[in-house]
Amino acid sequence: MKGFSRRRFLQASGSLVAIPAATSFLFSGCSLQGGTLKIAHNVRLTSWDPTTGLSSLDATAQSFYKAVFDSLITQHPDLSLSPGIVTDWGWSNDGSKIHLSLREDAFWHDGSQVTPDDVVWSLERAGSLTSDNPMRFIWSKITNFSISGNTVIADVKEYEPAIFKLMAYLTSYVLPKKAYTALGAEAWEKNPIGSGPYMLEKFEKNRFIRLKSFPQYWGPKPDFETVVIKMLPDAMDRVAELDSGDCDLAVNVPYEAFNRLSSSSKWEGQAYPIADVGMIFITNKEATMKDKNIRLAMHHAIDKQRLIDELLLGFGRPIDSMQVPGYDAYDPSIEIDFDPARARSYLSKAGYSKTNPVKLSIQTTRGYRPKDYEMIEMIVDMWREVGVEANIEVYSRTEHLKLRAQHKLAPAAFFNWSNSIGDPFS
């Protein structure tokens, strides 16, 4: 198994983009072993607790978390599972219990050993009714823990077929019981302790993270001794870092800049599609959005291929469901085509037309994903052609997550959605 390389920083990040392909650049002279790797990243980390709060649901923050912490189970880019902190797992014959066997060579960054008690405490904390863990509806199904040697055994209230996949997913990290309870939540943010390949050396909120290789890490030695992550939400700031030579690696590079930089021998560009979906969340805040005819009209009015060709310069692929190629539930027969005439017909059934349009608001980020705002501008123009008038409101990534948690999004809201385990229920 390879160490925690610059490629794994990309693959773990989830920051790789919605609908379009992921883009990144690596300085061609950057050593793949030892030294310091400097990354220009598009996300500002808001918390060092990977199991609670809004940031724990942010797929783009997972590269930071996976560098410092360990999930119960490890997942590879091809979605396969392999041992992490837990080396063996399974169900009882009747499907009422699970067992998790902990590796004996895992240590916390303070030098203490990772124990089965840490695993039990982490799962109990995650599933507590008072927990801020957004996945507690899953973790609360696991109860009545017992420990036998290095194995944790627990009851499962109801059969959850994806339980082990979820242990490689969001909020599934193991934290040190003794250290966390001694520090408390506030002090933890200044001195988080994990068991991952890197230790936190310095953190300046909204500015940068400096990580140092952990010599007692149970897995392969990381490729770099030190990693510095500059948090730069503005895409042009990341491009400027590349142009000035102040970083070795940048993610979520705008496509025009990608093509320009790719022509230089100084940089190695990578662009590839990933399972991070650009989507418009639809709410039922207004009566019009409860009408299926209106929702279908809005969908059939969008020319996805045109968005990809004209805005994304061909970097991306259209999809028609939340399941993407490679997921177990992917069904290629599901198609919702671009058909303006059909869209007008649906609107007519709902009592609307170009002269009597549906009116609504749509929220979008601006610069969080390449061409996110421009994409919504083009979609709004497409809607206008069939009889939907949409007013664009700009919000930040953090504002979206807060509004979504409070069920206060606008009737339509653009953001990315990612589910790396491919579970349809999740």
Residue ranges: model-predicted function:
Residues I39, I362, R384-S426:
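Periplasmic binding protein-like
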Residues T87-D132, I153-D155, E241, T288-K290:
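Aromatic- and charge-enriched surface segment that lines or borders ligand/interaction sites
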Residues R210-S213, K290-D381, E385:
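Append "and occasionally in soluble cytosolic enzymes with long acidic Gly/Pro-rich linkers
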Residues G90, K97, S101, R136-A179:
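Surface-exposed binding/hinge segments that line
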Residues H41-N93, E124, I193-G194:
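N-terminal lobe/hinge region of extracytoplasmic solute-binding protein
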Residues R8-G29:
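N-terminal export signals
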Residues E186, F214-R260, E389:
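Ligand-site clamp/hinge motif
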